[in-house]
Amino acid sequence: MQKRAIYPGTFDPITNGHIDIVTRATQMFDHVILAIAASPSKKPMFTLEERVALAQQATAHLGNVEVVGFSDLMANFARNQHATVLIRGLRAVADFEYEMQLAHMNRHLMPELESVFLMPSKEWSFISSSLVKEVARHQGDVTHFLPENVHQALMAKLA
């Protein structure tokens, strides 16, 4: 049986840090679903459809990645996708407490759902979508932190 994992997030937009995590996840699992949350309460810069398209382009080189948008409860989404693993990125110790709460709630809702925490490579450990957008808004150079297609889309949004 294939081991299916979900890497959920808002990915507004997807960064090279996210690509680092999903790339390493593809080496551990047979099939990785990059699950892009609608997250309307976060007021994303990019629509769900735009985020899905950007992520599909940025992960096209990874043969066992599927990009899907969702707005369901994570445990329900995982059950519907026949996935038993959630991949979560941890940039800093500060992320751990919140991630632990999520992991426990998800396990309560779906006991067979395991959370696997991956640290980004050192090069990406300090970046987030929010930080990249903020730097770009102030004309800072963010080309190193984003896939090329995402960088172009971000610059177009900010123009």
UniProtKB/Swiss-Prot annotation:
Name of the protein: Phosphopantetheine adenylyltransferase
Marked site positions, Transition state stabilizer: 18
Localization (cell): Cytoplasm
Catalytic activity: (R)-4'-phosphopantetheine + ATP + H(+) = 3'-dephospho-CoA + diphosphate
Enzyme class, broadest EC rank: transferase
EC number(s) recorded for this UniProt protein: 2.7.7.3
UniProt cofactor(s): Mg(2+)
UniProt-listed SUPFAM superfamilies: Nucleotidylyl transferase
Any Pfam family matching the protein: CTP_transf_like
InterPro entries per the UniProt record, alphabetical: Cyt_trans-like, PPAT, Rossmann-like_a/b/a_fold
Gene (UniProt): coaD
Residues holding substrate: 10, 42, 74, 88
Entry GO MF terms: ATP binding; identical protein binding; pantetheine-phosphate adenylyltransferase activity
Organism: Escherichia coli (strain K12)
Residues the record lists as binding ATP: 7-11, 18, 89-91, 99, 124-130
Note: The crystal structures in complex with substrates suggest the enzyme stabilizes the transition state but the functional groups of the enzyme are not directly involved in reaction catalysis.
Protein family membership: Belongs to the bacterial CoaD family.
